[in-house]
């Protein structure tokens, strides 16, 4: 079919020479699933639309991009999967999402507008922000919903959000935090719902453009990827500089006055897929950790470009295979001897906390987790 032929061309699927490296690399395939990235490539190359639409395994893919990185033919598997999911969505096929699809429903409500949000309740009196205009826009993402939605996980993702604002205030900046921000639409896009994603993109791009901000900072790796790559077609004027909070802090680390008597703490770091393999950002969070007195970073066996995914980026992969990946990753973190697993994305925290709550593991994989900004904020005088 012409659509599949064009997609195979754009993603270089036609260049696949069936070496099997993608399957050998895939975290899902490695733990015993019969899933293989090649099945989508072969279906696209041969124009098998019915097979693609009827294959629920398309939503098994973590879109972690490990296969992209290892493919000798440079096939863009991740882009191929995202586009094939759009095809499925148009045919009425969607993934089976956990929690009754409640999170997807909230995103779609935001996309349609008219939803009354209370996005500012997390801001304490000690945090200075502007509601509309300023040089720096702090993009909060959906963290204010996560802690309330997943109460059983005892999450503290908002602590990282507060820490980011506190650090900007310490640097003499008063960021814009808008009550009119909406979900970036990352999960809708990656589950195939392009129409609602585009509604969110247009709203959010206009919101930030109207603020006059020259820089947009976010603590969410998925929001970062969405703003840098997926929002690009929606900018009518040159976009603001878009950075992760760890990049922003690394740029200003010399201006942060850290306490000289910092408590000794061994940490390890989880590289988010969207920030690492999707955007190539590895050094900034490590630069921030290296600057904090008393903090010693011990890398996991799989780190940097080879880091293992947290296995649940779009709320559509929550199955026994994802849990096995999460448990394996937490065991790897514990094996470093670290007291704290530092993250740069709230989604990583959520999925790992979920895995830790498995009663069958008896606390075997428990480890404290903190956002990189939270750790830095606690160390600032």
Located regions from the model:
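Ferredoxin-type iron-sulfur electron-transfer modules in oxidoreductases and energy-metabolism complexes
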Residues: 1-7, 31-60, 64-65, 74-109, ...
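Cofactor-cradling patches in redox/metallo enzymes
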Residues: 146-240, 274-291, 295-381
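Short cysteine clusters
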Residues: 16-22, 26, 61-67, 71, ...
